[in-house]
Amino acid sequence: MATYLSTIGVHMYYAVEETKETRPTAKSAYTELVGVKGIPSMNPTPDNLETTTLNETEYKTYIPGLKDLGGSLGFTFNMSQDLKDAWEALVTADEAARATGKATWFYIDVPGLTDGLFFTGQPTPMGLPEMGVNSVLEVENSITVTNEPVWATKPAA
């Protein structure tokens, strides 16, 4: 019987490549992002490419095309000075990595799954979030995904 999962205990991390085009595999290489409150879907539907020929009489035919994550994805965080400092450190580390041809890897750890989700991305500097009366201050920080998200073995301790 399947064990169904919840979002309780999900963590999100980042690490800059030590070796170009090689995902970091040691847990110590990753830094946790604090205050993550929402992670966008990374399960896009592929485009449909129509392959209907003239001899079809009732239905069109298709093959799957490319998937599109939509470019920049918004991750929701509870705003704090710790988050602001951590996000600035992330953006700075990413800029330094890109200057040397390296990438920043993001890792989402869901308790109960044997693999983690990994992708490379470019974070956007944080702006001022929307604010309202008597509410939690949240910010949606953007990361532009730069490769195909993959499920892979979680980093070793």
Give short role names for the model-derived ranges.
Residues 1-4, 144, 148-157:
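Viral virion structural and adsorption modules
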Residues 54-120, 150-157:
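Extracellular/virion structural assembly segments
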Residues 2-79, 120-136:
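Solvent-exposed edge beta-strands and adjacent loop segments
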Residues 31-34, 92-99, 125-128, 140-144:
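Short, low-complexity, polar/charged sequence segments that are solvent-exposed and flexible
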Residues 16, 23-24, 86-90, 143:
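Extended hydrophobic/Leu-rich segments
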Residues 107-151:
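Short beta-strand and beta-hairpin "edge-sheet" elements
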